[in-house]
């Protein structure tokens, strides 16, 4: 299966009548492996900050997490594995695997829990595959 198929079939899938606003699979350096049509372009310093938060959980909490200049308030995640952010009625979940970052961005009516479930399910699968 191609990386684009993972995005199209596993991240942008319908959950209870809703789907993510955008999604992507990135390398740890921010290189886009696959993305949905409306996925925002990360800046290099944003990827650096995200990777630092995985290495040093809590790094982004004081300043917030920036994604394509949009600021997300960092909310509870899983140290070293998952970062979650909230911005207005939407938010973001980022799951780190051995080689990739699985990213899902949502808006209402999708819920934070639905976003996390979709992103983390694919991320956990990739971890089991050694990716």
UniProtKB/Swiss-Prot annotation:
Alphabetical list of SUPFAM superfamilies matching this protein: Profilin (actin-binding protein)
Motif (Involved in PIP2 interaction): 81-97
Cellular component annotations (GO), alphabetically ordered: cell cortex; cytoskeleton
Disulphides: 13-115
A GO molecular function held by the record: actin monomer binding
PTM sites of type Phosphothreonine: 111
PROSITE patterns associated with the record: PROFILIN (PS00414)
PTM description: Phosphorylated by MAP kinases.
Transmembrane segments: none
Signal peptide span: none
InterPro entries tied to this protein: PFN, PFN_euk, PFN_sf, Profilin_CS
Cellular localisation: Cytoplasm, Cytoskeleton
Pfam families referenced in this protein's UniProt entry, alphabetically: Profilin (PF00235)
Subunit field text: Occurs in many kinds of cells as a complex with monomeric actin in a 1:1 ratio.
Similarity-based family: Belongs to the profilin family.
Function: Binds to actin and affects the structure of the cytoskeleton. At high concentrations, profilin prevents the polymerization of actin, whereas it enhances it at low concentrations.
PANTHER family per UniProt: PROFILIN
Miscellaneous comment as given in the Swiss-Prot or TrEMBL entry: The variability of the residues taking part of IgE-binding epitopes might be responsible of the difference in cross-reactivity among olive pollen cultivars, and between distantly related pollen species, leading to a variable range of allergy reactions among atopic patients.
Listed name of the protein: Profilin-10
Organism: Phleum pratense
């Amino acid at each position: 299966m191609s990386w684009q198929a993972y995005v199209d079939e596993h991240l942008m899938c319908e959950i209870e009548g809703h789907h993510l606003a955008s999604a992507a699979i990135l390398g740890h350096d921010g290189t886009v492996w696959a993305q949905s049509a409306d996925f925002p372009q990360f800046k290099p310093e944003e990827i650096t900050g995200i990777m630092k938060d995985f290495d040093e959980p809590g790094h982004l909490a004081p300043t917030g997490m920036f994604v394509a200049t949009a600021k997300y308030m960092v909310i509870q995640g899983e140290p070293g594995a998952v970062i979650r952010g909230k911005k207005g009625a939407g938010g973001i979940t980022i799951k780190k695997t051995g080689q990739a970052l699985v990213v899902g961005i949502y808006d209402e009516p999708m819920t934070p829990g639905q976003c996390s479930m979709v992103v983390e399910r694919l991320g956990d699968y990739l971890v089991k595959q050694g990716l």
